[in-house]
Each structure stands twice: as structure tokens, then as C-alpha cells.
Swiss-Prot record:
InterPro entries: LolA/LolB/LppX. A lipid is attached at C21 (S-diacylglycerol cysteine). Keywords: Cell membrane, Lipoprotein, Membrane, Palmitate, Signal. A lipid is attached at C21 (N-palmitoyl cysteine). It comes from the Bacteria. It comes from Streptomyces coelicolor (strain ATCC BAA-471 / A3(2) / M145). Residues 1-20 form the signal peptide. This is Putative lipoprotein SCO4650. Residues 27-63 are annotated as: Disordered. Residues 43-58 have a biased composition (Low complexity). It is found in: Cell membrane.
Length: 285
């Protein structure tokens, strides 16, 4: 492999890896026609937006009433601080922390630290062990390390415009775009409202706060379980989602606090930013 070919390969892998990392830390994503979520590597993930025909009938009764109160309260809060850990089989494990808002599309900033997996090893080879992700209503930005920047004309940021992601082949990009634009704490509640066997587990103490624990399972080819812990204001304190991927078990645990916190997310300097479509196109030139 020539030096130029190697450079092109590394850049292409890095662009896909950054997409996988940012998508993973926001939770299970959009689906293809079979109700599976697909990533840059083609691995199926439990879907938060499976076709309506594959879902169980909407939950009714006292449990549904309680969960809809949580959905409304969390949605109205508009923003929160987030801490999460995600493991996607042998492919990727990471930690994320920051603040996200959802009043007008997903906005905010997360610091993502790679803790293991083949994707993390790819990023480490590029001199990147952590990444800053900035979410804006029309796009998100991933900050790479200096070694990556040296390969792409000194630019550190990769820009992913959601409309451009939707144009990617195979439906995977549309799933990513939908996931990142619609990821909010109350999405986990919406999943429970369509679950087959929702149950109120009981009262528990979560990070020093009294909470009510709810649990449910979504069926289909890739079974997915969701657990949430809700405080006395009907706000999520903790969420755990579990499922399977082609590379192994998927588990995400997220904690939410400081609802209503002010969220800032600025666009990186244009001179320090490369569009992902341009990067991928240049690799084939």
C-alpha cells in the first residue's frame, strides 16, 4: 500500500469512526426497513424507531398515564447535564459527559472518551483518545486530534450535515441523522410506552435521590430492554438500554441532572473544519 493510499484509508476510517462514536453516545438509533439500526460498519443495533407495524400496541392504563407524565415533564425541561457509558460488543466502548438541549433540535456539547474496542483503537492510532462533539440543529461537529489534522490540511473538526447524512446509501445515514436530531431523555420513555411488558419495579435510591424504577422489553429480531429511574418531579434520573449487535451486547447507561441548564454550542471556525462529504470524496480521487 502506498503512502497516499494509506493516508486515504486512514482518513476514511476516521470519518466513519467519528460518526460511530458520536452516534453511540446518543443511544440506539434509527432503523432500516427491517427495523434494525445500521452503522458505518453495517452492524445492526436495537432500534428506537422501528416501523409501527413491528411494535406492540400502545400501552394503556395507570402505567401509561404515569409514563406519559414523565414524557411530558422531561420534554418540557428542555435541557440537562448528561453522563453516559456505552459498550457496543467488541466494536466500541466509551464515556460521554456534557450538556444537551432539545427545545429546537438537539444542541449541546459532549466530551467523548474512548475506553475500548476496535473503533477506539482506530482513533488511538490517529492520536485521538477523546473527542469533543458539538450538536447544532442542522449538523454536528467532531473534533479530532493533531495527527488527523496533519492528514487533512491542518483542520481538526469534521462537520456532518444531517441532510447530507440522509443521502448516504443503504439508509444508514438517514438513521444516524434521525437519531442525533431526536435524541432526548424522553425518547426512552417513548420506547417504554410501546413495550410489550412494562412494569413498575419499585422505589429505589439513585445517586442520592428517591426514584421510581420502570422496566420494559421491546421484541423483534433484536430484543431490547429499557429501564428508567424517575424522580418525584417526573424527570429521568437514570436510563439503561440493553440489546444485541453483530459484535456483541450493547449496553448504555445514562444519568441526567440539572434540568433546564443553559446549553452552549458554537460552530467551530470554518478554517479549521472539513466537511465529511468532501473528505470522503477526496479519498476516492
Amino acid at each position: 500500500m502506498t503512502g497516499t493510499t494509506a493516508r486515504r484509508t486512514v482518513v476514511s476510517v476516521a470519518v466513519s469512526a467519528a460518526l460511530a462514536c458520536v452516534t453511540a453516545c446518543t443511544g440506539p438509533g434509527g432503523s432500516d426497513d427491517a427495523g434494525h439500526s445500521t452503522g458505518p460498519t453495517g452492524s445492526a443495533r436495537p432500534s428506537a424507531s422501528a416501523p409501527a407495524s413491528s411494535r406492540a400496541p400502545a400501552l394503556t392504563g395507570p402505567s401509561a398515564d404515569a409514563l406519559r407524565k414523565v414524557e411530558r415533564a422531561t420534554g418540557r425541561a428542555g435541557s440537562a447535564r448528561v453522563e453516559s457509558t456505552t459498550v457496543m460488543g467488541r466494536e466500541l466502548s466509551l464515556e460521554a459527559a456534557g450538556a444537551l438541549g432539545w427545545d429546537d433540535g438537539l444542541t449541546g456539547t459532549l466530551t467523548i472518551t474512548y475506553t475500548g474496542g476496535t473503533t477506539a483503537e482506530t482513533m488511538r492510532r490517529l492520536g485521538t483518545t477523546a473527542m469533543e462533539a458539538r450538536y447544532l440543529p442542522d449538523a454536528y461537529y467532531a473534533r479530532m486530534g493533531d495527527e488527523f489534522a496533519e492528514r487533512v490540511g491542518g483542520r481538526h473538526w469534521i462537520k456532518y450535515v444531517y441532510e447530507d447524512l440522509e443521502d448516504l446509501g443503504g439508509g444508514a445515514g438517514a438513521g444516524f441523522a434521525d437519531q442525533m436530531r431526536n435524541t432526548t431523555p424522553n425518547q426512552a420513555v417513548k420506547l417504554l410506552l410501546s413495550a410489550q411488558d412494562v412494569r413498575r419495579v419499585g422505589e429505589e435510591t439513585t445517586r442520592g435521590r428517591r426514584t421510581t424504577h420502570w422496566s420494559g422489553t421491546m421484541g423483534g429480531a433484536t430484543a431490547q430492554s429499557v429501564d428508567i429511574w424517575v424522580d418525584d418531579r417526573d424527570l429521568l434520573v437514570k436510563k439503561v438500554e440493553r440489546g444485541r449487535t453483530e459484535t456483541g451486547e450493547l449496553t448504555q447507561t445514562a444519568y441526567y441532572s440539572d434540568y433546564g441548564v443553559r446549553v452552549l454550542a458554537e460552530r467551530p471556525p470554518a478554517a479549521d473544519t472539513a466537511d465529511f462529504k468532501e473528505l470522503l470524496a477526496s479519498q476516492g480521487s
